[in-house]
UniProtKB/Swiss-Prot annotation:
Protein name: Protein KTI12 homolog
GO biological process, one term: tRNA wobble uridine modification
Residues that hold ATP according to the record: G8, L9, P10, Y11, S12, G13, K14, S15
Keyword field: ATP-binding, Nucleotide-binding, Phosphoprotein
Gene symbol of the encoding locus: KTI12
A Pfam match: KTI12
Cross-referenced SUPFAM superfamilies: P-loop containing nucleoside triphosphate hydrolases
Molecular-function GO term, any one: ATP binding
Organism from which the protein derives: Homo sapiens
Length: 354
């Protein structure tokens, strides 16, 4: 059955959404398999995305795991970053080869894919929504007071600009607040990040998050491998179960590509007769052109049609055309065409030589 690919940066709620979808589909009696980084690595390790060789091996393991599970009867959910469009195209090719539909669920953190933790009270005033560093409080150590002062100064500057008056100096009330900034929490982590950290237990360093953001290739519904596309911003937005069900169980599977299909096998007798008939036609043509003049109609063995003679032909040229005809005919074998092989080859020669 279908393939569901989750895509998004860390802390965007992918795992929670994947579990929500798994529970909803399992409640309908469907067999659902979830493939994620932890299932492949044994435990989620964010450091993999900092090493190109290990990340490439991880993508190969994820693709192999999906390919093993993918069938017309089970639903496979891939819960990973999947931020490279080339990898998403490979997954699309797997679904197309298995003749099963797929859809893409793109999870985005509120405030944009690179927004960091927000300042306390930022939701109450849009002008105070100031993004700060991804660096956790535990790594700040003695710099907590300086960080709090910087945040408060940015807050005051943002409020001043919103109110239409930019002030150069910090008021005394703000200075008194800065002195106690280290004692009161200055940063509040969004609910989506809390749930993501609680669910996975993995920590992505600020440098790694920045690198992933720069490498991230956002899905585009104009690409056939990125549609149908469902975009979810935050955890408050409900999961579009009706649309996902329609995409997975009502849509037709992507049409198979001709290069991925097995060509029909030709029987041994067909190939033997094809080789014999074309050889006889060439031998008859070489013999007939010895006494022919341009404009004559040549009658060749095994044919009911005629070939107009226009110029002398070499054996090398005729052999090349014979190989081309045999290669094409082997790809489309049909035992019903056996009596017409000589006429078909004669028509091919006539079109190729004139």
């Amino acid at each position: 059955m279908p393939l569901v690919v989750f895509c998004g940066l860390p802390y965007s709620g992918k795992s929670r959404r994947a579990e929500e979808l798994r529970v909803a589909l399992a409640a309908e009696g469907r067999a659902v398999y979830v493939v994620d980084d932890a299932a492949v690595l044994g435990a989620e390790d964010p450091a993999v995305y900092g090493d190109s060789a290990r990340e490439k091996a991880l993508r190969g393991a994820l693709r192999a795991s999906v390919e093993r599970r993918l069938s017309r009867h089970d639903v496979v959910i891939l819960d990973s970053l999947n931020y490279i469009k080339g990898f998403r195209y490979e997954l699309y090719c797997l679904a197309r080869a298995a003749r099963t539909p797929l859809c893409l669920v793109y999870c985005v953190r509120p405030g944009g894919p690179i927004a960091g933790p927000q300042v306390a009270g930022a939701n109450e005033n849009p002008g105070r929504n100031v993004s700060v560093s991804w660096r956790p409080r535990a790594e700040e150590d003695g710099r907590a007071q300086a960080a709090g002062s910087s945040v408060l100064r940015e807050l005051h500057t943002a409020d001043s600009v919103v109110n239409g008056s930019a002030q150069a100096d910090v008021p005394k009330e703000l200075e008194r607040e800065e002195s106690g900034a280290a004692e009161s929490p200055a940063l509040v982590t969004p609910d989506s990040e809390k749930s993501a950290k609680h669910g996975s237990g993995a920590f992505y360093s600020p440098e790694l998050l920045e690198a992933l953001t720069l490498r991230f290739e956002a899905p585009d519904s104009r690409n056939r491998w990125d549609r149908p596309l469902f975009t979810l911003v935050g955890l408050e937005e409900p999961l579009p179960l009706a649309g996902i069900r329609s995409a997975l169980f009502e849509n037709r599977a992507p049409p198979p590509h001709q290069s991925t299909q097995s060509q029909p096998l030709a029987s041994g007798s067909f190939l033997h007769q094809l080789d014999q008939v074309t050889s006889q036609v060439l031998a008859g043509l070489m013999e007939a052109q010895k006494s022919a003049v341009p404009g004559d109609l040549l009658t060749l063995p095994g044919t009911t049609e005629h070939l107009r003679f226009t110029r002398p032909l070499t054996m090398a040229e005729l052999s090349r055309l014979r190989r081309q005809f045999i290669s094409y005919t082997k790809m489309h074998p049909n035992n019903e065409n056996l009596p017409q092989l000589a006429n078909m080859f004669l028509q091919y020669l006539s079109q190729s030589l004139h």
